[in-house]
Amino acid sequence: MIVGAGLSGLATAISCAASGHSVQVIEQAKELAEVGAGLQITPNASRLFRHWNLPASVWASAAEPTAMTVHRYTGEVLAHESNYDKNIRAKYAGAPFIDMHRVDLQQALYARARELDVAFHFDERVERIDCACHPATLTTRAGREYRGDLIVAADGLWSRCRECFVGRKDDPLPTGDLAYRIVLDAAQIEDPELRAWVEHPECHIWIGPGAHAVAYSLRGGKMLNIVLLVPDNLPPGVSRQPGSVEEMRALFAGWDPVYVQCSAVPGWTGWWLTMAG
C-alpha cells in the first residue's frame, strides 16, 4: 500500500507494480488536481522515465534546454554553456536534462500506473495505521480498512502516516527560505529577448545578494517557469500566499532589466520551503 498519489507515490507504485507486486494507492484528494509549477529533471531521473516506459506524452510536454547561462544579478554573464542538451546526452549515455510542468509528469506517471493495474482509492484520509499485525492495516476516516505487507508513506510534508508511526505530531521544519513562483504563457511575454529564451528552450540563473533566481522553458517553449529564492518573510503559520507586483519590484530593484521584465506581472505565489524532520 502506498499513501499519497504525488510524484513520489506514483513513482513507487510503478516500480513496485513493474516488479510483480500488487499495489494499492490511497489518496486524500478526490482527483488529481492540476497544481504545481515547473520541475527540472536531471539525467538520473529521465533515465528512469525510459526504464518505466512512461507514455510519449512525458517527452512531448518537456523542454530540453539548449543552453545554460549563469548571470550576475545585474545581468553580467558569469558562465555559459552552448549545446547543453547535446553535452548532457553525451555525458550521461543519452539521458537528457529536461524541464517540465509538474502536472504533465504526474499525469504521465498516473497513466503508466493504471496500465500496470495499480488500484487507486481517492477521497480517503488516513486515520490510523496498525503495523503490529500482519498484514499491516490502514484505517481511513470513513472507517474503511486496507491491508498490505508494506505501507509506504508518500503523503508529503504534512504526513499523517509519519505521525502514526512516531506516535506524535511531526510538523515540517522551516529552512528559512521562501520561493516565489510563477508560470507564464509565451503570449504574456512582450520582451523580445525573453520571448526568444522561451521559444528556444534555455535555462538562466541569476545570482544576487541574499537571493537567486531561475527561469526556464516548459512545454516545448510555450511557457516560462520562474522561481526566486529569498529569505522567508511569511507570517507565522502561513505556508503559501499570493505575491504582489510591488513585492517583486522591491526584490528586483537593480536587477537585470530582462529579468525585471518577467517579474513585473501579476500571479506570483510565495511558497514556504520546508523539510521533514
Residue ranges and their predicted role:
Residues 273-277:
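FAD-binding beta-loop-beta segment adjacent to the flavin cofactor pocket
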Residues 8, 31, 158:
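Conserved Rossmann-like nucleotide-cofactor binding loop
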